[in-house]
Design a protein with these regions (language model features):
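Short, Lys/Arg-enriched, Trp-marked, Pro/Gly-tolerant hinge/linker segments that flank
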Residues: 104-118, 126-189, 202-214
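N-terminal regulatory/effector-sensing and dimerization cores
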Residues: 2-3, 7-106
């Protein structure tokens, strides 16, 4: 499937359910800190941006920069102030990636500055958006991932600390009740709301509320691809109304739900 507008295009194919791609041109899209259940690879084509989430903290990305973002890694990438930027973003199913490119299966983002690898990424992504067959596209994707593994002399670093045992009941509650209140979550951990916010942010990089919104957006992505109506989706995810869903989705995904669909 190919869907586009003036600045953004998405590519998906039921024959390749493990991959989704996006292109954005002359965009002003800004993102709140967020995470994906997928492994993501981004490329900056024009303009500059500021990336947060790598082991080196904040990094400035320029034309030709690549960034590898493991599943679950909290990050954000935004254009320089008052500037436009163009970029490409690839999302890969995490289990599929682990099976086919385990060398990329870390948990900390990495920034690469490699002209040859960037050129290969662009060629591979152009092929995804073309009318080539699924086998040819998948072969190009696998070849690019092998090149990524070679370019990363060492596997991606694994520096994410285990979530403290005290927060395990909070994560379990969020799994069972995605819209649980802060008071409910604090009670599950045996902490005050303030203590929970501080401990949860230290462990996950997000406040409990930001974590909930991020999870809602990730659920919305899959539900939108399945054709769920926006009004129904807003109700299912606990948003006040459709407009509330649209605002939150755009803040995390850089595009409205209707355009993502």
């Amino acid at each position: 499937m190919y869907a586009s507008n003036n600045t953004t295009a998405f590519w998906r194919d039921p024959a390749l359910p493990h991959v989704e791609s996006r292109r954005a041109c002359n965009s002003r899209a800004c993102y709140k800190p967020h995470s994906h259940p997928t492994f993501s690879i981004g490329a900056v084509d024009a303009g500059g941006s500021i990336f947060t989430g790598s082991q080196d903290g904040q990094a400035v990305l320029a034309n030709g920069s690549l960034v590898l973002v493991p599943a679950g890694c909290v990050h954000a990438c935004n254009p320089l102030p008052d500037a436009l930027w163009s970029y490409q973003m690839l999302h890969l199913d995490a289990q599929w990636l682990q099976a086919h490119a385990p060398g990329l299966d870390g948990d900390t983002a990495a920034v690469l500055h490699c002209p040859l690898l960037y050129a290969q990424f662009c060629a591979m992504n152009a092929l995804l958006f073309s009318r080539a067959g699924a086998e040819e596209k998948n072969a190009a994707l696998l070849a690019f991932l092998r090149a990524c593994v070679s370019a990363c002399a060492d596997p991606l670093p694994s520096e994410r600390k285990p979530v403290p045992q005290q927060l395990a009941p909070v994560l379990e509650t969020l799994q069972e009740q995605p819209s649980a209140s802060l008071r409910q979550l604090a009670q599950a951990a045996g902490l005050s709301p303030y203590q929970l916010i501080r401990a949860f942010r230290a462990a996950t990089g997000m406040t409990p509320h930001a974590y909930q919104l991020n999870a809602h957006v990730n659920r919305a992505r899959s539900r939108l691809q399945a054709g769920t109506a926006l009004a129904q989706l807003a109700h299912e995810l606990g948003f006040a109304d459709q407009s509330h869903l649209q605002r939150v989705f755009k803040a995390h995904a850089g595009i409205t739900p209707g355009r993502y669909r």
